[in-house]
Design a protein with these regions (language model features):
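A beta-rich soluble binding module of mature secreted/lumenal proteins
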Residues: 3, 19-185
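Bacterial Sec-type N-terminal signal peptides, specifically the leucine/valine-rich hydrophobic h-region
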Residues: 13-16
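Bacterial N-terminal signal peptides that target proteins for export
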Residues: 1-8
Length: 185
């Protein structure tokens, strides 16, 4: 498969996101975010729609964003992130990655890599901060506060579901006023 320069830059930025310091949406002196107690990866696997996110360089002009997770025989999780560029009916592009569960995290912290640039051993950039009991909505963020995503199994969510996600974000020190809603076709 041929990879364009822009796609290579995209996956490189995603891979480095967990290594970069920054606190876009959290106070520098805030305690680390708190993850959920555990995640059943069998239930978590499948397609998720991005409801909102912190703006970031590797998702500029992305709409119609989805993330698909698939369990692999080696115990890791395959990740396919897809977005359309420009508008919700723009040309789709995808990035393929692999996630490894951080030991001792009960599947709540993962190190996700989208390029041959690995994260430092034991460092997770994908923390599950909220997950409703039915695995229909999730809040995922980076421990340094630079990234935050609201995810759902459907293209839209209820006002109550959004309030629960926002509340979980705020409890973890994330600013919800910085969230950008994602257009889903």
């Amino acid at each position: 498969m041929k990879v364009s320069l822009s796609a290579a830059i995209l996956v490189g930025c995603v891979a480095l996101s967990g290594c970069m310091s920054g606190t876009m949406g959290r106070a520098k002196d805030a305690a680390p975010p708190t993850t959920v107690a555990s995640v059943d990866l069998n239930k978590y696997a499948g397609k998720w729609y991005e409801i909102a996110r912190y703006p970031n360089s590797f998702q500029k002009k992305c709409e119609g964003v989805t993330a698909e997770y698939a369990l692999r025989p080696d115990g890791r999780v395959g990740v396919t992130n897809t977005c359309a560029t420009g508008t919700s009916d723009g040309k789709a592009r995808s990035a393929q990655g692999v996630a490894a569960v951080i030991d001792g995290s009960n599947n709540t912290k993962l190190a996700v890599n989208f390029a041959p640039i690995p994260l430092p051993k034991g460092q997770g950039n994908y923390w599950v901060l909220y997950l409703d009991p039915n695995y229909q909505t999730a809040l995922v963020g980076s421990p340094n506060g630079s990234y935050l995503w609201l995810l759902a199994r459907t293209k839209s969510i209820s006002v109550d579901q959004r309030a629960a996600l926002n509340s979980a974000a705020e409890r973890n020190g994330f600013r919800t006023d910085l969230l950008k809603d994602t257009i889903q076709p």
